[in-house]
Amino acid sequence: MMDLKVDEEEVDSGQPVSIQAFASSSTLHGISHIFSYERLSLKRVVWALCFMGSLALLALVCTNRIQYYFLYPHVTKLDEVAATRLTFPAVTFCNLNEFRFSRVTKNDLYHAGELLALLNNRYEIPDTQTADEKQLEILQDKANFRNFKPKPFNMLEFYDRAGHDIREMLLSCFFRGEQCSPEDFKVVFTRYGKCYTFNAGQDGKPRLITMKGGTGNGLEIMLDIQQDEYLPVWGETDETSFEAGIKVQIHSQDEPPLIDQLGFGVAPGFQTFVSCQEQRLIYLPPPWGDCKATTGDSEFYDTYSITACRIDCETRYLVENCNCRMVHMPGDAPYCTPEQYKECADPALDFLVEKDNEYCVCEMPCNVTRYGKELSMVKIPSKASAKYLAKKYNKSEQYIGENILVLDIFFEALNYETIEQKKAYEVAGLLGDIGGQMGLFIGASILTVLELFDYAYEVIKHRLCRRGKCRKNHKRNNTDKGVALSMDDVKRHNPCESLRGHPAGMTYAANILPHHPARGTFEDFTC
């Protein structure tokens, strides 16, 4: 049996349109004049040069925009926001004299006399020429260490016991016109010793708020700084103070006081008015800014702040260099002894604060609340009120003038200022600039770019198919792919025999043409 087959292997006919046809229908401006069916002419050359120049300018501008984006620029937005109520800040103050003279015992003098510059290293009073006779007599009695058996000494207990007591210092206290008491102040230790914080927001007490601005709507306290309790100054040490008055810091409840570096002084004999404005600062994290976005790095404080970071860093520095910590420092390291204070802790901390700029590098938190201040003051007491105040507090007029001060802290207005860093150039701006430049120089859009990619894909696919990567075998069917016939089929449908043996009387002309109506198609094919 012999089969006749017509097999054909053909290439898928996916040929893309010509570049001229694509250019004529593309939304990309200018290329229809470059790729045309006309022969090369000056017009086409000029269009090509203009198009390439526009592409070059577009690339230049887009490169500039992309470089600017990766500079991560930012702008600062300043705004004032009115409020119906504001949280009153924490107010911390310290007497500039760390220890009360009357509270220094013989045991204190034995252990810390040299630290306080009251004794020399031989336990002797160094200079008696400038001493007050009454103080000198008391000090000589305390400095007599014959048959004295020293007892254990603890710096924390000494600071707490010998520091100024709020119950003796506070003569009057009002907040928003309502009386307050020493119980509203929380003890806090700083480098100035025993200090007090009003509105600390701790120990279960809520943070106080104010509903109005101006004097009378904040905190007003009258204090006695007790200059007669100041330690006599016969020499200079890190614990010696030449000033009289208090140091004050206004700060957020979320950060500890760093009053020795950030506080301002208030002098006796004056009423000091402090007008505040709350400022909320919002910084950007890298790469747009330098703020620290993460919190919780400190093992001593829950909320990250620059002051918390500095205290934490100073504590680690002293523990590493002196194997102890100062009274105001957090942690569980042992407190420094008076000898360690004098020989190591005070010099090391002074060096760290004033000269070392590399050990304690504290990043700015991304959200900061601070308080701008404006100070003004008036003399107190007046001549008219001096006698009244002296009688009221059972003191002399001279004592009132040398020891009494009034501190009035209030909000200037019931609003706050926001200082916010914002991204100056974001992805949306970059895309908008690039899209605008594309439209300006070449009249293109994102869809135009998709057109180009689609045409490039079709061209690449066609070229790959021409190399034999897309060939397929196909069999022709009876209608359009050809028919495979066996010899039996040919014999059964043999028209030639019928032509040779046609019935009698049926004749065909010798000159009959193929496809004549008298003959069939199949007969034409087989014969």
Curated annotation (Swiss-Prot):
The keyword Disulfide bond applies. The record marks 356 as: Involved in proton-dependent gating. Inhibited by the diuretic drug amiloride. Inhibited by Cs(1+) ions. Inhibited by the spider venom psalmotoxin-1; this locks the channel into its desensitized conformation. Channel activity is increased by the heterodimeric snake venom neurotoxin composed of MitTx-alpha and MitTx-beta; this slows channel closure and increases the magnitude of the steady-state current that is triggered by low pH. Changing residue 350 to N: Loss of pH-gated channel activity. A motif (GAS motif) lies at residues 443-445. This is Acid-sensing ion channel 1. The keyword Plastid does not apply. Homotrimer. Heterotrimer; with other ASIC proteins producing channel with different properties. Pfam families: ASC. Residues 72-424 are extracellular. Residues 1-49, 455-527 are cytoplasmic. Keywords: Cell membrane, Cell projection, Disulfide bond, Glycoprotein, Ion channel, Ion transport, Membrane, Postsynaptic cell membrane, Sodium, Sodium channel, Sodium transport, Synapse, Transmembrane, Transmembrane helix, Transport.
